Regions:
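Short, aromatic/basic amphipathic alpha-helical patches
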Residues: 66-77, 232
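Active-site/ligand-binding-proximal alpha/beta "capping" segment
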Residues: 196-248
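Short acidic-hydrophobic, aromatic-tinged amphipathic segments that line or gate anion-handling sites
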Residues: 3-8, 79-84, 174-182, 240
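Boundary-proximal intrinsically disordered activation/regulatory segments immediately upstream
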Residues: 1-67, 155-156
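Amphipathic alpha-helical repeat scaffolds
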Residues: 40, 129-137, 251-256
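Structured adenosyl-cofactor binding patch, chiefly the S-adenosyl-L-methionine
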Residues: 100-102, 140-144, 153-172, 230-269
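A glycine-rich helix N-cap at a beta->alpha junction
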Residues: 74-93
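RNA substrate-binding interface of SAM-dependent RNA methyltransferases
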Residues: 4, 107-202
Length: 269
């Protein structure tokens, strides 16, 4: 294992961690070299467990033989950049990383039809834009029995650094894929019934027994603020509301997803 000492925050080796934007990391012009950054030993470990390929590590010097040692032992041929804390604290948000970051190659996108073959409970996210919300939804999906998360392409990227961080690495544990136009038809063709989370006069309560009884169910959540598109609601089999108190009519999409997944996800063993 070759360790490179970094003493200057402006060193080019830090570009991927400190200066490249999320869009530059995605590198749509050269997807084979697209990257994402994982933070903290727990999250990096989950990414490695999922088969993500590391490109380099960046960590505080003391962690090389400390809490980073086990991860580095799994990747003996990967470059390691180490620096003292006074250099690394110039990285925005470094205090959230638990002293360790890893640049990794983006995995190839999955085919949603293949992903859904063995699934019975899935989440569909239509244009969820906030990476924090997205990460929280993935964490709830992992904890509360959802087999997969499907996303429309206009929404946030599950591999954005903030989404990965908030998810606690569950974006590497719950399979996900992007949907194309006509996705409700795809779900119906594969035997799924679709439940749109929306406030409508014809909506059913989340605890309606018909929902939990469905053999295959897709829980469809909408964008922050505006919620689901009218056309999406019309194309779904159910429109579903969460019963609430004190005149509150809605929850943040991340909070609503946790409630919905708890009620409709696969029961824990």
């Amino acid at each position: 294992m070759e360790i490179h000492q970094i003493t200057d925050f402006n060193a080019p080796e830090l570009d991927v961690y400190a200066r490249l934007t999320e869009n530059q990391l995605v590198n749509r012009a050269d997807p084979e070299n697209a990257l994402f950054v994982a933070e903290s030993p727990l999250v990096i470990g989950r990414a490695l467990d999922a088969g993500c390929a590391p490109v380099s590590f960046l960590m505080e010097q003391k962690h090389i033989e400390g809490k980073g040692a086990a991860l580095l032992a799994r990747c003996p041929d990967v470059a390691v950049y180490a620096a003292e804390l006074d250099v690394l604290t110039q990285l925005t948000g470094f205090h959230l990383t638990r002293g360790m970051l890893c640049a990794m190659r983006r995995p190839k996108l999955r085919d949603p039809a293949v992903l859904l073959q063995d699934a019975s409970r899935v989440a569909v996210l239509e244009n969820v834009m906030n990476p924090t919300n997205l990460g929280a939804i993935f964490r709830s999906a992992a904890a509360l029995g959802m087999d997969a998360v499907l996303l429309t392409s206009a929404g946030s990227d599950p591999l954005y650094r903030r989404a990965v961080r908030v998810s606690m690495g569950t974006v590497f544990q719950v399979p996900w894929a992007y949907l194309s136009e006509g996705w409700t038809e795809l779900l119906h063709t594969l035997g799924f019934r679709t439940a749109a989370m929306a406030l409508r006069d014809d909506s059913v309560r989340l605890d309606d027994p018909r929902l939990a009884a469905e053999r295959k169910l897709a829980v469809v959540m909408g964008t922050e603020g505006d919620g689901l598109a009218d056309a999406t609601i019309a194309a779904c089999d159910y429109t579903v509301r969460i019963p609430m108190h004190h005149g509150v009519d809605s929850l943040n999409v991340a909070a609503a997803s946790a409630v919905a997944f708890y009620q409709l996800g696969k029961p824990a063993e």
